[in-house]
């Protein structure tokens, strides 16, 4: 399915760093919000006719209810780089990567044994982990490495903007097909190499919102974490892996422990560190522990019995109290990272 409609811009709702949100009225008088990327298009004005991609909304996919405006006029956004994003599509454009700026940095074989590396399967994991870390270690340097398992434009993430503006994240690197970080790298390994040059202490690899899931065993985009974890291990790194737990999730395949987490743990050939919070709900804890204990021969399970859970955040539309276990598990992951740093 690919559906384009003409419409008229009726109102500007938001002008953020790198994009514009407007209200568009279509030929059938439907009115919806649309996003205009200012990297690839001029700012649109009230009364202007625009071409809009409405495919995701028509399919009722998780795009936040937005349509996307296509470029409609001559436009040039100069870049010194030669590495293409959205390759071989009508919207391909170039970026300047760190590999182009300083190739010598990336020609050595890396060692990641001095870097704490977290691999997240969901974008909503990034915010609580970073908030907790910076709450108790404000001078820590955190780099968020954003890949292409979800949406691609980092500037669209409200969580990332909040983290950067409030200094809960120091640097943002986008890699693979993702773009609009503070820095651009080709892949996760080179992103980690570059993050070391920034004196990063904790590197958190995460997708943006909008990961793909099909309900099948391997049909989810975060399965790529298997390859990323194995590559990190190949170069001496040890990954901290925050397991996705939930007591509030209605979908059986994600209840208690998400099948995404379990599939990654089952098929990755490298060992990861899995912090487990000892939940007050002993029945829930026992069920989570029994499942994860099956992976003890391969992975390192760490009990975290005490955290400071006064940091309240939201995830995927559910408040802290509505999906408390999800956050407590992420806070426990951050608590484990703090303890690792204290031992160094």
Write out the residue ranges for each language-model feature.
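Accessory terminal and edge-of-domain segments that mediate assembly/interaction
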Residues: 29, 40-48, 70-82, 116-119, ...
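Phosphate-binding glycine-rich loops and their immediate beta-loop-alpha structural context
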Residues: 94-185
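Flexible, glycine-rich phosphate/dinucleotide-binding loops
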Residues: 59, 151, 248
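Residue-level signal for short, function-critical loop segments
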Residues: 56, 148-149, 245
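Non-transmembrane, aqueous-exposed alpha-helical and coiled segments at domain scale
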Residues: 2-26, 136-139, 154, 158-206, ...
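Extended, charged alpha/beta regions that create polyanion-binding interfaces
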Residues: 2-114, 128, 137-140
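Generic preference for well-ordered secondary structure
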Residues: 31-34, 113, 143, 175, ...
């Amino acid at each position: 399915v690919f559906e384009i409609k003409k419409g008229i811009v009726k109102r500007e709702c938001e002008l953020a760093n790198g994009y514009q949100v407007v209200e568009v009225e279509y030929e059938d008088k439907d009115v919806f919000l649309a996003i205009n990327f200012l990297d690839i298009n001029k700012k649109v004005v009230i009364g202007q006719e625009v071409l809009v991609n409405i495919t995701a909304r028509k399919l009722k996919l998780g795009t936040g209810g937005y349509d996307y405006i296509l470029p409609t006029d001559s436009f040039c956004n100069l870049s010194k780089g030669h590495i293409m994003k959205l390759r071989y599509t009508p919207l391909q454009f170039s970026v300047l990567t760190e590999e182009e700026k300083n190739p010598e940095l990336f020609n050595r074989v890396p060692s990641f044994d001095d870097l704490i590396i977290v691999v997240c399967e969901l974008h909503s994991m990034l915010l609580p982990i970073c908030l907790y870390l910076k709450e108790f270690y404000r001078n820590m340097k955190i780099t968020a490495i954003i890949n292409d398992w979800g949406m691609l434009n980092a500037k669209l993430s409200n969580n990332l903007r909040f983290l950067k503006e409030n200094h809960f994240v120091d640097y943002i690197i986008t890699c693979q097909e993702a773009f609009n970080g503070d820095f651009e790298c080709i892949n996760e390994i080179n992103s980690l190499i570059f993050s070391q040059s920034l004196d990063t202490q904790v590197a958190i690899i995460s997708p943006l919102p909008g990961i793909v899931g099909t309900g099948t065993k391997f049909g989810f985009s975060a399965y790529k974490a298997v390859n990323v974890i194995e590559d990190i291990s190949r170069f001496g790194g040890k990954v901290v892996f925050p397991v996705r737990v939930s007591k509030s999730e209605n979908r059986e395949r994600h209840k208690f422990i998400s099948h995404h987490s379990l599939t990654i743990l089952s098929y990755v050939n490298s060992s990861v560190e899995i912090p487990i919070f000892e939940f007050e709900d002993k029945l829930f804890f026992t069920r989570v522990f029994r499942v994860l204990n099956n992976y003890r021969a391969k992975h390192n399970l760490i009990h975290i019995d005490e955290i400071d859970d006064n940091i309240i955040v939201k995830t995927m539309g559910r408040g802290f109290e509505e999906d408390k276990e999800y956050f407590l598990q992420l806070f426990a992951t951050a608590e484990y990272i703090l303890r690792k740093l204290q031992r160094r």
